[in-house]
From Swiss-Prot:
Annotated InterPro entries: RuBisCO, RuBisCo_large_chain_AS, RuBisCO_lsu_C, RuBisCO_lsu_C_sf, RuBisCO_lsu_fd_N, RuBisCO_lsu_N_sf, RuBisCO_lsuI
Post-translational modifications: The disulfide bond which can form in the large chain dimeric partners within the hexadecamer appears to be associated with oxidative stress and protein turnover.
Record carries keyword NADP: no
Location within or outside the cell: Plastid, Chloroplast
Residues the record lists as binding substrate: 123, 173, 177, 295, 327, 379
Protein name per its UniProtKB record: Ribulose bisphosphate carboxylase large chain
Leftover remarks: The basic functional RuBisCO is composed of a large chain homodimer in a 'head-to-tail' conformation. In form I RuBisCO this homodimer is arranged in a barrel-like tetramer with the small subunits forming a tetrameric 'cap' on each end of the 'barrel'.
Cofactor dependence: Mg(2+)
Residues given in the record as Mg(2+) binding sites: 201, 203-204
Assembly with partners or alone: Heterohexadecamer of 8 large chains and 8 small chains; disulfide-linked. The disulfide link is formed within the large subunit homodimers.
One of the GO biological process terms: photorespiration
């Protein structure tokens, strides 16, 4: 190269491959308030040191590639690169480590969950040097939080819209989830709402199929909730699923729901995508619609303990993207959810400020500043005998959703709804009187059956139903110490 054509990029350039840890492993780094912090569970391939594995994650999810390139000299890598600033072994696991990575805020587009995830959990999860990789938690700095609008309305505004205070809200997913005509579907909604539920719900895969087109379903469900409102004097809602094959069709359904005057719509945020979800959340905010979020497909991402992404990260992403409700597991029902871990991400959904607490799986202190909270939805295999535990675990700011636990009542849908409402009111009253729901729950339900034949019938049907399986998502403990105990 002649002196006339030599550039700054060529000065000191050495072609070839060098270890990631030489550039991206910086244990002396002091994190900034504006950094996005990530905790990865890293399982390196045999022979790969944990420092190299952690540095590889930082590199491949930020500025790095597999070899030194000329254009590195045209920017400031020290300003833009991700940094692995800490590594610790996972208790009780061989060859697993928690790698802490800090990302400069300038790496991310403002207000875009899509861009954030494309960087942090993009190609790096297919990296050959890693046997497995899981994103356990993120710390979102307040500077980045403030670029998001978050939930369309939030918990307090929803309560004000519905005029419902001092108790969890009650819902029901209409079953069978597929196959009903629009008219029969609307009839089931009406019966449940008339019986005392606050909401009924489309299931996640109810979109616009040949047996029930979306417009017909919207019309019959709107008729059902208005009729139930007139009879009960309470505000009712049905989660009209606006999820569609295109964003244009999704928005068309949301617009039609608004024109019908219903209070709430629904979206499958993982299958629909974060870009679509954020767009729908903006529309709901501008047009007074609440937004219920279903997490269909989440277990594909978060079920395995050593690979994928923990649901607490997906929950944080949803709070930023926008949603007023999200399914969060039940702890006591048929779906996955260990108590302390579930309550950890429930707090991340609802509270303004959450302290680091590894006993609940929370790796970082999170400050949401003024971002509204999200109501957790407990749904899946729950019935009246679970009501005391659900009320005690989730508290008032939650939605308890009984599908089969309403529609499976031997006397029909409306009596099933009555049973759930009576059980909830009994638990709330007992709690307010100072009784312990955890120890006296069954007694409280039995007492309530004396003045509610609907509840008595429900208790008889489901008295033997239990879902007792070991949770997959558990806290890390030292297995050798556990054995000694």
């Amino acid at each position: 190269m002649s002196p006339q054509t030599e550039t700054k990029a060529s000065v000191g350039f050495k072609a070839g491959v060098k270890d990631y840890k030489l550039t991206y492993y910086t244990p002396e780094y002091e994190t900034k308030d504006t950094d996005i912090l990530a905790a990865f569970r890293v399982t390196p391939q045999p022979g790969v040191p944990p420092e190299e594995a952690g540095a590889a994650v930082a590199a491949e999810s930020s500025t790095g590639t597999w070899t030194t390139v000329w254009t590195d000299g045209l920017t400031s890598l020290d300003r833009y690169k991700g940094r692995c600033y800490g590594i610790e072994p996972v208790p009780g696991e061989d060859n697993q480590y928690i790698a802490y990575v800090a990302y400069p805020l300038d790496l991310f587009e403002e207000g875009s969950v899509t861009n954030m995830f494309t960087s942090i959990v993009g190609n790096v999860f297919g990296f050959k040097a890693l046997r497995a990789l899981r994103l356990e938690d993120l710390r979102i700095p307040t500077a980045y939080v403030k670029t998001f609008d978050g939930p369309p309305h939030g918990i307090q505004v929803e309560r004000d819209k519905l005029n419902k205070y001092g108790r969890p809200l009650l819902g029901c997913t209409i079953k069978p989830k597929l196959g009903l005509s629009a008219k029969n579907y609307g009839r089931a909604c009406y019966e449940c709402l008339r019986g005392g539920l606050d909401f009924t719900k489309d299931d996640e895969n109810v979109n616009s199929q040949p047996f029930m087109r979306w417009r017909d379903r919207f019309l019959f469900c709107a008729e059902a909730l208005y009729k139930a409102q007139a009879e009960t004097g309470e505000i009712k809602g049905h989660y009209l699923n606006a999820t569609a094959g295109t964003c244009e069709d999704m928005m068309k359904r949301a617009v039609f729901a608004r024109e019908l005057g219903v209070p709430i719509v629904m979206h499958d945020y993982l299958t629909g995508g974060f870009t679509a979800n954020t767009s729908l959340a903006h529309y709901c905010r501008d047009n007074g619609l609440l937004l219920h979020i279903h997490r269909a497909m989440h277990a594909v991402i978060d079920r395995q303990k050593n690979h994928g992404m923990h649901f607490r990260v997906l929950a944080k992403a949803l709070r930023m993207s926008g949603g007023d409700h999200i399914h969060s597991g039940t702890v006591v029902g048929k779906l996955e959810g260990e108590r302390e871990i579930t309550l950890g991400f429930v707090d991340l959904l609802r509270d303004d400020f959450i302290e680091k607490d590894r006993s609940r799986g929370i790796y970082f202190t999170q400050d949401w500043v003024s971002l509204p909270g999200v109501l957790p939805v407990a749904s899946g295999g729950i019935h009246v005998w679970h009501m005391p535990a659900l009320t005690e675990i989730f508290g008032d700011d939650s939605v308890l959703q009984f599908g089969g636990g309403t529609l499976g009542h031997p006397w029909g849908n409306a009596p099933g709804a009555v049973a759930n409402r009576v059980a909830l009111e009994a638990c709330v009253q007992a709690r307010n009187e100072g009784r312990d729901l955890a120890t006296e729950g069954n007694e409280i339900i039995r007492e309530a059956t004396k003045w509610s034949p609907e509840l008595a019938a429900a208790c008889e049907v489901w008295k033997e139903i239990k879902f007792e399986f070991q949770a997959m998502d558990t806290l890390d403990t030292d297995k050798d110490k556990d054995k000694k105990r």
